[in-house]
């Protein structure tokens, strides 16, 4: 059992906490994990942190668990176990010798911050962000961490990397253009309001629940970096829409080799799923939509709707997923695997 520090108890950090605590990934983890420490510079009110962990609009009540705040001793008490809570801006100043895995869910992680976790005593530092930095970016089952500090991406990169890996293995990819439709986030607003943007993309400040809003995203390029041989061959766009969770990733691909049929693509996906364990991607023929994926740690390819062949070398492949849960699962799996790997 390896102790974990979670830095950042926002939506992603709280989802990761619940998943680790409930052993949702226990069958896939190389090393069992347990949360023993939290660091958060934003939620400094421990009673509010406990409340937000217990009640979640998307994922529901955390049934069967008792969560409270020990304000005097600066800790959360979860099922009678103590989780120390810190509010340290410089993670290198933390004492992490008893937390071999640190997972940064702040969305503001950098190479220097990842290095800080190792300086503080952790053996493995994972930063959830759509970047590669100098430490690389890992999607479990597609590429591997090269050292004990690495980034893991959000769900959109994971979903896209899976599509690209499947098609590249079977048919080769000349280029790919992506179109992601995803739920609004905390970057969006309830009402039209001013949005500070150096690039003057003021549309991000429009009401998130009422609009289809294009947003900047480097996910396509990052996914192309993660899948070998595809760096520079992938580009695309992302739009936030008025749903609270869930996403679909459409990928339009020009293949190198001839695609025999849609059934051939379905067979390739099914074979990939079989080889990569069922948590990474689900192959289905059930007519799933995005809300059916909420809370699941895997993406889903539904054969009824997720593939179209336009011509012999041009196809569309889609996956649906819960971006937050998929990102949390990948971070935990990469952390556990890296810790267990000599």
What does each model-found stretch correspond to?
Residues 12, 134-203:
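Rossmann-like dinucleotide-binding core of oxidoreductases
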Residues 3-18:
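Glycine-rich adenosine-cofactor-binding loop
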Residues 296-330, 334-340:
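Short, charged interaction patches at domain edges and termini
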Residues 36, 100, 123:
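Conserved acidic residues
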Residues 93-116:
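Hydrophobic alpha-helical hairpins/lids featuring a short glycine-rich hinge
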Residues 103-104, 147-155, 206-213:
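Flexible, glycine/proline-enriched loop segments at strand-loop-helix junctions
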Residues 18, 22, 26-94, 174-175, ...:
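C-terminal substrate-binding/catalytic lobe of Rossmann-fold NAD(P)-dependent oxidoreductases
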Residues 108-148:
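Rossmann-fold NAD(P)-binding glycine/threonine-rich loop
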């Amino acid at each position: 059992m390896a102790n974990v520090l979670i830095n950042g108890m926002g939506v992603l950090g709280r989802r990761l906490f619940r998943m680790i605590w409930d052993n949702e990934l226990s069958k896939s983890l190389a090393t069992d994990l347990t949360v023993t420490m939290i660091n958060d510079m934003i939620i400094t009110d421990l009673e509010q942190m406990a409340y937000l962990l217990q009640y979640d609009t998307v994922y529901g009540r955390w049934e069967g668990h008792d969560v409270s705040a020990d304000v005097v001793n600066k800790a959360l008490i979860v099922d009678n176990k103590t989780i120390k809570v810190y509010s340290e801006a410089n993670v290198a100043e933390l004492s992490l010798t008893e937390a071999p895995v640190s997972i940064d869910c702040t969305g503001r992680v950098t190479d220097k911050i990842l290095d800080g976790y190792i300086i503080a005593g952790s053996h493995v530092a994972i930063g959830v962000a759509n970047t590669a930095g100098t430490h690389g970016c890992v999607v479990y089952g597609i590429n591997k961490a090269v050292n004990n500090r690495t980034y893991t991406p959000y769900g959109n990169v994971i979903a896209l990397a899976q599509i690209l890996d499947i098609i590249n293995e079977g048919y080769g990819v000349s280029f790919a253009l992506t179109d992601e439709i995803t739920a609004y986030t905390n970057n969006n607003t309830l009402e039209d309001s001013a949005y500070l943007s150096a690039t003057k993309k003021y549309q991000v400040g429009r009401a998130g629940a009422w609009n289809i809003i294009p947003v900047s995203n480097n996910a396509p390029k990052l996914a192309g970096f993660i899948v070998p041989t595809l760096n520079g061959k992938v580009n695309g766009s992302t739009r936030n829409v008025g749903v609270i969770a869930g996403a679909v990733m459409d990928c339009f691909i020009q293949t190198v080799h001839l695609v025999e049929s849609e059934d051939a693509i379905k067979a390739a996906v099914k074979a990939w799923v079989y080889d990569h364990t069922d948590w990474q991607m689900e192959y289905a023929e059930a007519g799933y939509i995005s809300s059916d994926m909420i809370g699941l740690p895997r993406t889903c390819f539904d054969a009824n709707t997720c593939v179209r062949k336009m011509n012999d070398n041009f196809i569309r492949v889609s996956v649906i997923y819960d971006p937050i849960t998929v990102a949390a699962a990948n971070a935990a799996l990469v952390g556990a695997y890296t810790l267990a790997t000599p």
